From Swiss-Prot:
PANTHER family: EUKARYOTIC TRANSLATION INITIATION FACTOR 2 SUBUNIT 1 (PTHR10602:SF0). This is Translation initiation factor 2 subunit alpha. InterPro entries: NA-bd_OB-fold (IPR012340), S1_domain (IPR003029), S1_IF2_alpha (IPR044126), TIF2_asu_arc (IPR022964), TIF2_asu_C (IPR024055), TIF2_asu_middle_sf (IPR024054), TIF_2_asu (IPR011488). Heterotrimer composed of an alpha, a beta and a gamma chain.
Length: 275
C-alpha cells in the first residue's frame, strides 16, 4: 500500500481512507497513505443534507475519498469530510492513488534486483522523488520522456540503473491530442495542389519536433482536419498556432482563404519510445 513521505496530511488534502468504526455521532477512519494515522468524520460532514442514520452512508471496511479539514499534529487529531468531496475530486484522487500503487510496484521490482528491502527503497528513492515531484510516478514519467538523467542528484546512480529498464518497459507517457478543422479554398486551377502542398509542408515541419505528431485528413471540400499529439496541452496549442499561422499565410499569398475551426482535446497514453 503506497504511503506518503510526510507524517501528516495537510488541511485541504484529499486522502484515501478506510472506515474503521462507526458511531451515532461520526466515524473513525484509517488513512491508507499515512500508516498509523486515523481521522474522525463527524456526522455533519458525511453528507450535505441531514443524516438520520450514518450507516446509510458509511460501512465498516469501506474505502472512501475524504477531504482533510483540520490537522493537529500535537494532539494527533485529523478531521475529515465526505460531503466536501465532489465527483471530479474523488476521481482525481483515486487516479493519483492508482498511480502511486503502480509506482510502488515498479520500485519493489528495482529493490528486488538490488537485493534491498522496500523500506530502504522507500527511504532512498520514494521520499526524495515525492518531495521533488509531488508524486513518484510523475518522476518516472519524466524519466521515461526525458531520460534517466533527470533523476540524477535525487537518487543514487545504483537506483537509476536498476530503474532504467523497468521504467522503459512499464511507464507510459501521457499525451494530449487536440483536433481542429481548416476551411480552405483557393480559386485557381491548381488550387488543390496549392492546398495539399501547404498542408504537407506544415505537417512535416511540425513533425520534426520531439514528441510531436501531426496528421491531416480530408473531410470533404473545403474542410481539412488536423490532429496534433503532444506531451501536454500547451505544447499542442503552440504547434497548432504555428501551423495555422503558416497555412493562413501561404493560402493568402496564393489568393485563397483559410479559416481555423477549433474542436476538442483528448488525453491518451503511449508507451515510451526508447531512451
Amino acid at each position: 500500500m503506497p504511503r506518503k513521505a510526510k507524517e501528516y496530511p495537510e488541511e485541504g488534502e484529499f486522502v484515501v481512507a478506510t472506515v474503521k468504526n462507526i458511531h451515532p455521532y461520526g466515524a473513525f477512519l484509517t488513512l491508507d497513505e499515512y500508516p498509523g494515522k486515523e481521522g474522525f468524520m463527524h456526522i455533519s460532514e458525511v453528507a450535505p443534507t441531514w443524516v438520520k442514520n450514518i450507516r446509510d452512508y458509511l460501512k465498516e471496511g469501506q474505502k472512501i475519498v475524504a477531504k482533510v479539514i483540520r490537522v493537529d499534529p500535537e494532539k494527533g487529531h485529523i478531521d475529515l469530510s465526505l460531503k466536501r468531496v465532489n465527483q471530479q475530486q474523488r476521481k482525481a484522487k483515486l487516479q493519483e492513488y492508482k498511480r502511486a500503487q503502480k509506482a510502488e510496484n515498479l520500485l519493489k521490482m528495482a529493490a528486488e534486483k538490488l537485493g534491498k528491502d522496500f523500506e530502504t527503497a522507500w527511504r532512498e528513492v520514494w521520499v526524495p522523488l515525492e518531495e521533488e515531484y509531488g508524486e513518484v510516478y510523475a518522476a518516472f514519467e519524466d524519466a521515461a520522456q526525458n531520460g534517466m538523467d533527470v533523476l540524477k542528484g535525487l537518487i543514487s546512480d545504483e537506483w537509476i540503473e536498476a530503474l532504467k529498464p523497468i521504467i522503459e518497459a512499464y511507464v507510459e507517457i501521457p499525451t494530449v491530442t487536440i483536433d481542429a478543422e481548416f476551411e480552405i479554398t483557393v480559386p485557381k486551377p491548381n488550387g488543390i495542389e496549392i492546398i495539399k502542398e501547404a498542408l504537407i509542408k506544415a505537417r512535416d515541419r511540425a513533425n520534426q519536433e520531439k514528441d510531436i505528431e501531426v496528421k491531416f485528413s480530408y473531410q470533404g471540400a473545403p474542410r481539412y482536419r488536423i490532429d496534433i499529439t503532444a506531451p501536454d496541452y500547451y505544447k499542442a496549442e503552440e504547434v497548432l498556432e504555428d501551423i495555422a499561422e503558416e497555412i493562413l499565410r501561404v493560402i493568402k499569398e496564393a489568393g485563397g482563404e483559410a479559416t481555423l475551426i477549433r474542436k476538442e482535446k483528448r488525453i491518451k497514453k503511449v508507451k515510451k519510445r526508447g531512451s
